[in-house]
Amino acid sequence: MKNIILALLCVGVFTSSSFGQGCVAVRHMSCSAGTGANSNSMMHPGQWQVSLGFRNLHSYKHYVGADYQPQREAAGTNVINDSQSFDLGATYSVTDRLLLAVNLPLNFNYRTSLYEHYGNALNVNPAQKRFGTMANGIGDARLTASYWVLDPLKHMKGNFSVGLGLKLPTGDSKAMDKFHRRASDGSDYTIEKPVDQSIQLGDGGVGINLEIQGYQQLFSRTSLYYNGFYMSNPRNVNDAANVAPDKVVTDEMVRYMSVADQYAGRVGLNYALAPKAGIGATLGARIEGVPAYDLIGGSDGFRRPGYIFSIEPGISYSTAKNTFFV
């Protein structure tokens, strides 16, 4: 009988320090097939693994390059992004080494600012009013095939897999919301346009995803884990307008939003605190970002390049068929 394993039902709330632009258009993504943290994550032919991951991201600091801009927060003109993401996944083990996976994110994004509405300056926004926009729904789905390079039955203490997949444009790349404007008489009215790229649900392109993940036992209770991916988006721009309809387009290059590449990498240690009870602790680091130029295809359009660095402490609990991470 085929086995069904419920794995990686986790809640992750991470405090992230962002370096780069004030808003980096990074969408929640992870490696497709489990955690690869140790040999216990191995699957056998015919097994299914169902996963659910949650991540909360709060962004409020501004950088220009590596230079932090505290004056934006002091003046109250900083942009604040809040994103909650659920990553739903299912993995099927074709053989001991070949895995097929599908992942679908569910995103709830909210953004507040001054400059996108009345403006930052006192003469146009005397009360310094802040307004919000949002985009909620499914993101871009991913289909991935991955392969353990070493025979899992012979290399229990260390192994790594490589994967190749497609990212499909199932998320709305032109999510709309209302933006506030202040008339000359001080009255308020709204216009509708696409929300900022940093909270869009999708990018509108078919991407090619290359990933790697693995583990290595270091000591009797300690193992190293690592994973990462690079997602290439050959499409140049999508049809989401970057410039508001009441503004003049001064640069045709950024009239529409760019369909940008994305990357991420994670590395950390997993320590078995109480092996018999299935309790462990993890400490890792994550970097994720958007490059200024794509690997394949054009790099036109408006994009928010930069990267986010996060520290990821955690506690895990494992049973015969379930693994929970917090």
Question: Language-model features: where?
Answer:
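Residues on the lipid-exposed face of transmembrane beta-strands in outer-membrane beta-barrel proteins
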Residues: 39-41, 52-54, 88-92, 102, ...
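Transmembrane beta-strands of outer-membrane beta-barrel pores
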Residues: 54-60, 104-110, 140, 149, ...
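Extracellular loop and loop/strand-boundary signature of outer-membrane beta-barrel proteins
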Residues: 37, 71-76, 125-133, 195-200, ...
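Residues that define the transmembrane beta-barrel architecture of outer-membrane proteins
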Residues: 46, 82-86, 127, 135-141, ...
